[in-house]
Design a protein with these regions (language model features):
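C-terminal, well-structured subdomains that either form a transmembrane helix-short loop-helix hairpin
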Residues: 98-101, 105, 159-188
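Hydrophobic transmembrane alpha-helical segments that form the core helix bundle
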Residues: 7-144, 149
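Membrane-embedded and juxtamembrane structural elements of multi-pass membrane proteins
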Residues: 11-15, 26-33, 156-171, 179
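Cytosolic-facing loops and C-terminal tails of multi-pass membrane proteins
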Residues: 132-163, 167, 186-189
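Histidine-centered catalytic micro-motifs
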Residues: 1, 115-123, 165-176
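Short, small-residue-biased leader/transition segments that mark boundaries at the very start
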Residues: 2-6
Length: 189
């Protein structure tokens, strides 16, 4: 993964190695917003909105074109959760709508906690983009290990986190079924 590589400063200051700027005074409210709407931010992440907003290396027309898949998926989910299910619930439409909204926020909070705990810990290192351009395959594997962190807990925690408590193994073997991460974790350690 490239989650540990900083081409430019991100939304949040997640490491002491990132130079402090006054905009980082908003880290806490921005982090809360990111957690509540995590599913949408994940969907928008690959659009690189900062390229149009800040760096001016992309036009809004390009962003709109790049967002076609995201818009289609978002439209389907919004219609399903906030129109279809409430409508078929009839007189219970409002509780269903509220329940779907609450469930989506809870899922976003949980997902963000799992992802943040695997990527932005004291032990996880960050790397500058120019340091990884010509890295060897061995250096890539080492960066995957050094750029993420595992967290421990009960079997239920591993199940409820989709086994992403084994973030290092997830980065090393992204195609491996998640339930196998715990088998290879001792060998990686």
């Amino acid at each position: 993964g490239l989650g540990d590589v900083y081409k430019r400063q991100g939304l949040l200051r997640v490491s002491e190695s990132q130079k402090w700027e006054p905009r980082f005074l908003f880290n806490i409210p921005l982090a809360i917003q990111l957690m509540v709407f995590f599913e949408w931010y994940v969907g928008l992440q690959n659009l690189h909105l900062e390229d149009a907003l800040i760096y001016k290396t992309k036009t809004w027309k390009q962003v709109w074109a790049d967002a076609a898949k995201f818009r289609k998926k978002a439209r389907r989910q919004i219609l399903k959760d906030y129109v279809f299910f409430p409508v078929i619930a009839g007189p219970n439409a409002l509780p269903v709508l509220a329940g779907n909204a609450i469930a989506n926020v809870i899922r976003s909070l949980w997902s963000s906690a799992v992802i943040f705990n695997g990527h932005f810990t004291e032990d996880a290192e960050t790397f500058e983009a120019d340091n990884v351009e010509n890295e060897t395959r061995a250096e890539w594997y080492l960066r995957q290990i050094r750029g993420s962190s595992n967290f421990t807990g009960t079997d239920w925690l591993h199940i409820l986190s989709g086994n992403l408590s084994h973030q290092i193994e997830h980065h090393l073997f992204p195609d491996m079924p998640a339930n196998r991460y715990s088998e290879v974790a001792p060998k990686i350690k």
